[in-house]
């Protein structure tokens, strides 16, 4: 009799994806982030589900419901801060995962890569809408500023913004729909992740050398399950340190003030993981130009496979490309720093130069 693991129609799929999956024998810890992202997603859906049970999506009570959750609900503060800092861990893993793909040429699996870019957009949209829900000052003004950018679209812009707002300003209707979408999107993301994995398992994993490893494969379990568990423990250690010792380190203190449409905070800025894109947006003095640059800064990932001209897939044996890659990383860190600074003399020009360099490296210098 065959093992049920290999004969049962449903368990067979799980077996071929996570247990008997042939994997290259030489993939490094940079390949752990896919599984960590899956764990982050599961964690976010779980904590989010329990948070949604206590949350009210109404402008009058949203802020108080979050406050009530932290004070009155059993371990509500753990749920809330796990969810908020879990989003930060999600983006850390996401950016490292993308960086790994860029460094080792994993983008040559075009379907997997494009699916990943769609996933990135979906996760960013979800995170943005989630940030609006506590209805603090930054939530309200962040939503106002970012949704207002759509008004830069010629001809339909103004109507589009009012359509998204459900009125003439960010108000009750906006909050309600953002909550609905924030609840729905993670499940759509889960489905897209399945497609992402489906495309990946068509080709098999890439490896650090960038050469085919078909002649040297090992089963995923136990080798990589153990390796992933180590990564999981390390991630949970960092997350729990954040949640239990300094849960507000990555947040904005302005968000502890209830939203007030009559009072603008001195510095409106998004969460840290959007600062690089925000800096690119601000570095262009024209509204439409800024919005285009913002969208292109992420959409540019789509064209990377077509810019690949090297005979080697991975950067492992290309020192010059490595220098450029780390220059790109440094540039993104600079942009992240600039995004959090006020719009004043030295920061404006640094942001503009960093934005130009970002696009230059990817389009002109890299290939």
Curated annotation (Swiss-Prot):
Keywords per UniProt: Electron transport, Heme, Iron, Membrane, Metal-binding, Mitochondrion, Mitochondrion inner membrane, Respiratory chain, Transmembrane, Transmembrane helix, Transport, Ubiquinone
- The record lists heme b b562 as bound by 83, 182
Q: Does the keyword Hydrolase apply?
A: no
Give residues annotated as binding heme b b566: 97, 196
The taxonomy runs: Eukaryota, Metazoa, Chordata, Craniata, Vertebrata
A Gene Ontology term for the protein's cellular component: respiratory chain complex III
Where can this protein be found?
Mitochondrion inner membrane
Q: One of this protein's GO BP terms?
A: mitochondrial electron transport, ubiquinol to cytochrome c
Q: Which cofactor does it need?
A: heme b
Name the chain's protein: Cytochrome b
In this chain, a ubiquinone is annotated as bound at 201
* Entry GO MF terms: metal ion binding; ubiquinol-cytochrome-c reductase activity
Task: Kindly list the residue ranges recorded as spanning the membrane.
Answer: 33-53, 77-98, 113-133, 178-198, 226-246, 288-308, 320-340, 347-367
Look up and give the organism this protein is from.
Hypsugo savii
Pfam families to which the protein is assigned, alphabetical: Cytochrom_B_C (PF00032), Cytochrome_B (PF00033)
Q: What S-S linkages are listed for this chain?
A: none
Q: How is the cofactor bound?
A: Binds 2 heme b groups non-covalently.
Q: Give the protein's function.
A: Component of the ubiquinol-cytochrome c reductase complex (complex III or cytochrome b-c1 complex) that is part of the mitochondrial respiratory chain. The b-c1 complex mediates electron transfer from ubiquinol to cytochrome c. Contributes to the generation of a proton gradient across the mitochondrial membrane that is then used for ATP synthesis.
């Amino acid at each position: 009799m065959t093992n049920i693991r290999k004969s049962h129609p449903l368990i067979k799929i799980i077996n071929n994806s996570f247990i008997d999956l042939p994997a290259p024998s030489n993939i490094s810890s940079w390949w752990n982030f896919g599984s960590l992202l899956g764990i982050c997603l599961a964690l976010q859906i779980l904590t989010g589900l329990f948070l949604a049970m206590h949350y009210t999506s109404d402008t009058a009570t949203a802020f108080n419901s979050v406050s009530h959750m932290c004070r009155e609900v059993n371990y509500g503060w753990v749920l809330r801060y796990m969810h908020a800092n879990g989003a930060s861990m999600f983006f850390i893993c996401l950016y490292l995962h993308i960086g790994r793909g860029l460094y080792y040429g994993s983008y040559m699996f075009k379907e997997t890569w494009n699916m990943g870019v769609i996933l990135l957009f979906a996760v960013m949209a979800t995170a943005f809408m989630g940030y609006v829900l506590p209805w603090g000052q930054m939530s309200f003004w962040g939503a106002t500023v970012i949704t207002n950018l759509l008004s830069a679209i010629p001809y339909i812009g103004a109507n589009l913004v009012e359509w998204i707002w459900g009125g003439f300003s960010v108000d009750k209707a906006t909050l309600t729909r953002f909550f609905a979408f924030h609840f729905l999107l993670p499940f759509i993301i889960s489905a897209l992740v399945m497609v992402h994995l489906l495309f990946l398992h068509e080709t098999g994993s890439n490896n650090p050398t960038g050469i085919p490893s078909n002649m040297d494969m090992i089963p995923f379990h136990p080798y990589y399950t153990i390796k992933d568990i180590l990564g999981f423990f390390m991630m949970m250690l960092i997350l729990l340190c954040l949640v239990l010792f300094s849960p507000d380190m990555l947040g904005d203190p302005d968000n502890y003030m209830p939203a007030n449409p009559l009072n603008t905070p001195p510095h409106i800025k998004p969460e840290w993981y959007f600062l690089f894109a925000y800096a690119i947006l601000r570095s262009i003095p024209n509204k439409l130009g800024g919005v285009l640059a913002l969208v292109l800064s992420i959409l540019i990932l789509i064209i990377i496979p077509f810019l690949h001209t090297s005979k080697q897939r991975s950067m492992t044996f290309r020192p010059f490309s490595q220098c450029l890659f780390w220059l790109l990383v440094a540039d993104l860190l600079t942009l992240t720093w600039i995004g959090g600074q006020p719009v004043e003399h030295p920061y404006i020009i640094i942001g503009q130069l960093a934005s130009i360099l970002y696009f230059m490296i990817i389009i002109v210098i890299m290939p």
